[in-house]
């Protein structure tokens, strides 16, 4: 590897916002985020890959540091013998993928000698470059877990620090390198790309992929090839996915596309603002675009949604109220009214074990008690047949079944750190942990294509806690996974769609806030990834999650209500983020530090108020109507008069932060009723029924 000096040459690829998650050396529990620029250059018939800190005046004392147990890090030391070993150790680390979306805290790097490190030391420590002829392989992260990262391994077994592409597009780098070398998947690990040989013919024929007019423009210097390729890549996505078109419109991708056609001189071939507005209008239906004279800015004004209504919540549905709505054969009467009451106030804990089976679809709402008894017998037999499948596999068989072996390994690691502070799962050899493990292993037999993905234990834990029964917990979990399945698929299409939909809703509510996030490289809302992936499981206390999930399971007041919950949380934090001028790292840090500090009743009030505000809007964009499942500006809204009992206590929703310049305050009157004293948790966890 060559010294990381200044390199000149023809730039083939260039990407800013490529981070190294550095190590602190003597401080073993912290990691830093160093933003840099990655380039691929041609020089004297040699191809050079070069990374260096983005700011030439980099002062490592200003770097923010994260705990190592909460971020994805491949450590890089100066000793060559250690580099290969440590790199391999971290690459195979279970933490490296899941914890990319689990960063919880950052710290300033302390100086061991009391002096700030010099600019030269900080820069030379992390800058690197190498010739493509020295490249042995490229390790890719598992797709879907936050932003992508790549790790370069050289032929002398030196493993370079992982490069994290916070802004995406790591695939463009791979495509650029494939012009010069052949990259093939490793037979042992499909995420590892092996460098086989030089491939100059690919480079020579690359221009033929473009049509002749475009090639002529490139040769004449009127068209930036890199920008054109970027535009073509994303234009294909626009045609395939209208939601992607919406997101790209929000990100002002059109400026970049048309800039590639204008050439390097911004004063020539300037596209009229009116045409840009027309393009964005098509890409973002329902939003009005105003072009300002100031170049480079498009102001997308939000539609006047009108006054936001005041929302009230009620007490949790009691066992007595539930019983009154059951007929002599055990059928639930007036299901819609029951769902409305649950949405308004949740359920008392004594009722959850029974009601959750209906909310999750395990029991049909119109089933009789006898039919449910028969169903449970059938499901019990089915469960144990599947459980026997993995229980009966011998060690010799498992040695030849790498997928099952990998599933078991992930499950064991996840189970051992899932809700261990909860009395239900604390201690060694806890029956709750054993059941958690067995249910997840059985789910691998139930859906072997999906198997187990990190994070699924977070979804199962509250279900097992409430059901206290292995079979019932499994089938409730299977039903919940039917809803959440796309979140955990390898392509992560469900997560991508939700992030795009969330951006659409947030821009409608406050385009100014969205523009600020975009200016801080946070426009794709990746800091909400964990919220969506496991439905806020790590953002609220365990008891609050029980309340939040049962409210969401009613599917009221609209489709994708969880996205409005995200909007409500971001709305509450908007003022602090903008007034303190938070950048990318500060936004990520701030959002993660909200964990366990969010008032669930306050957020439910705000989210419902937002939904009612949108329903009453006569100019609601069609894209938003589709996201929320609204037809003709109509939605199934919970009746404010639900609960005829005069003793029902209603709590007012705090004023929206969008409607006031003051920081939002949590209402003391909105106290939750599911305090630890009201939800009995027996110290004798052996009351679980493993069946």
Curated annotation (Swiss-Prot):
Pfam families: PH_RBD, RabGAP-TBC. PROSITE patterns: TBC_RABGAP. Residues 346-556 form the Rab-GAP TBC domain. Keywords: Acetylation, Cytoplasm, GTPase activation, Phosphoprotein. The modification Phosphothreonine is found at residue 689. The keyword Magnesium does not apply. Ubiquitous. Coiled coil: none annotated. It is found in: Cytoplasm. The keyword Phosphoprotein applies. One of its GO terms (cellular component) is cytoplasm. The modification N-acetylalanine is found at residue 2. GO terms for molecular function: GTPase activator activity. The modification Phosphoserine is found at residues 23, 70, 205, 274, 640, 675. GO terms for biological process: regulation of GTPase activity. PANTHER family: TBC1 DOMAIN FAMILY MEMBER 15, TBC1 DOMAIN FAMILY MEMBER GTPASE-ACTIVATING PROTEIN. Acts as a GTPase activating protein for RAB7A. Does not act on RAB4, RAB5 or RAB6. Interacts with non-phosphorylated form of RAB8A; phosphorylation of RAB8A at 'Thr-72' disrupts this interaction. Interacts with ARMC12. This is TBC1 domain family member 15. The lineage of its organism: Eukaryota, Metazoa, Chordata, Craniata, Vertebrata.
């Amino acid at each position: 590897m060559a010294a990381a000096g200044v390199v000149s040459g023809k730039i083939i690829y260039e990407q800013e916002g490529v981070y190294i998650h550095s190590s602190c050396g003597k401080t073993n529990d912290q990691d830093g985020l160093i933003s840099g620029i990655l380039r691929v250059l041609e020089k004297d018939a040699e191809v050079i890959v070069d990374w260096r800190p983005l700011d030439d005046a980099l002062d490592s004392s200003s770097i923010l540091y994260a705990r190592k147990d909460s971020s994805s890090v491949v450590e890089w030391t100066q000793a060559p013998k250690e580099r290969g070993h440590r790199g391999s150790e971290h690459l195979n680390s279970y933490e490296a993928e899941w914890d990319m979306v689990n960063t919880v805290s950052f710290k300033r790097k302390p100086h061991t000698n009391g002096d700030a490190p010099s600019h030269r030391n900080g820069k030379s420590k992390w800058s690197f470059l190498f010739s493509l002829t020295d490249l042995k392989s490229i390790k890719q992260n598992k797709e879907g877990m936050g932003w992508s990262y790549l790790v370069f391994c050289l032929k002398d077994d030196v493993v370079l620090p992982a490069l994290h592409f916070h802004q995406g597009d790591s695939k463009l780098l791979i495509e650029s390198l494939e012009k010069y070398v052949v990259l093939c998947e490793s037979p042992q690990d499909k995420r590892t790309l092996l460098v086989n040989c030089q491939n100059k013919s690919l480079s020579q024929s690359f221009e033929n992929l473009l049509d002749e007019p475009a090639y002529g423009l490139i040769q004449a210097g009127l068209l930036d090839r890199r920008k054109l390729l970027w535009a073509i890549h994303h234009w294909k996505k626009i045609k395939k996915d209208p939601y992607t078109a919406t997101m790209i419109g929000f990100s002002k991708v059109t400026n970049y596309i048309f800039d590639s056609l204008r050439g390097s001189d911004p004063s020539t071939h300037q596209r009229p603002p009116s045409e840009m507005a027309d393009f964005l209008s098509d890409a973002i239906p329902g939003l009005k675009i105003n072009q300002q004279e100031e170049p480079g800015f498009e102001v997308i004004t939000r539609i006047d949604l009108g006054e936001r209504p005041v929302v009230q919540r009620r007490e949790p549905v009691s066992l007595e109220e539930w019983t009154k709505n059951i007929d002599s054969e055990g059928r639930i009467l007036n299901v819609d009214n029951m769902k409305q009451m649950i949405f308004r106030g949740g359920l008392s804990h004594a009722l959850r074990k029974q009601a959750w089976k209906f909310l999750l679809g395990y029991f049909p709402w119109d089933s009789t008690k006898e039919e449910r008894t028969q169903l449970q017998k059938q499901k019990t037999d089915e469960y144990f047949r599947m459980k026997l499948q993995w229980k009966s596999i011998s060690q010799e068989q498992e040695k030849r079944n790498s997928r099952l072996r990998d599933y078991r390994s992930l499950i064991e690691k996840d189970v051992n750190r899932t809700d261990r502070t909860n009395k239900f799962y604390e201690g060694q050899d806890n029956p709750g942990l054993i059941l958690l493990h067995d249910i997840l292993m059985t789910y691998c037999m139930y859906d072997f294509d999906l198997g187990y993905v990190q994070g699924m234990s977070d979804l199962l834990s509250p279900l097992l806690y409430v059901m206290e029964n292995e079979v019932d917990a499994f089938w409730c979990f299977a039903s919940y996974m039917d809803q959440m399945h796309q979140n955990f698929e390898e392509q992560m299409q469900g997560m991508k769609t939700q992030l795009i939909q969330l951006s659409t809703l947030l821009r409608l509510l406050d385009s100014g806030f969205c523009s600020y996030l975009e200016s801080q490289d946070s426009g794709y809302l990746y800091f909400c990834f964990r919220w969506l992936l496991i439905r806020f499981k790590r953002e609220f206390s365990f008891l609050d999650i029980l309340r939040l999930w049962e409210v969401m399971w009613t599917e009221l007041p609209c489709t994708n209500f969880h996205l409005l919950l995200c909007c409500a949380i971001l709305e509450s934090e908007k003022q602090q983020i903008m007034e303190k001028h938070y950048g990318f790292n500060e936004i990520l840090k701030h959002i993660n530090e909200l964990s366990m500090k969010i008032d669930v009743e306050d957020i439910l009030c705000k989210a419902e108020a937002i939904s009612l505000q949108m329903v009453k809007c006569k100019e609601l964009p069609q894209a938003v109507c589709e996201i929320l499942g609204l037809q003709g500006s109509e939605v199934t809204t919970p009746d404010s008069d639900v609960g005829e009992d005069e003793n029902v206590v209603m709590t007012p929703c705090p004023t929206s932060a969008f409607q006031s310049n003051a920081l939002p305050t949590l209402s003391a009157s909105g106290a939750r009723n599911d305090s630890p004293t009201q939800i009995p948790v027996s110290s004798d966890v052996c009351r679980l029924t493993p069946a």
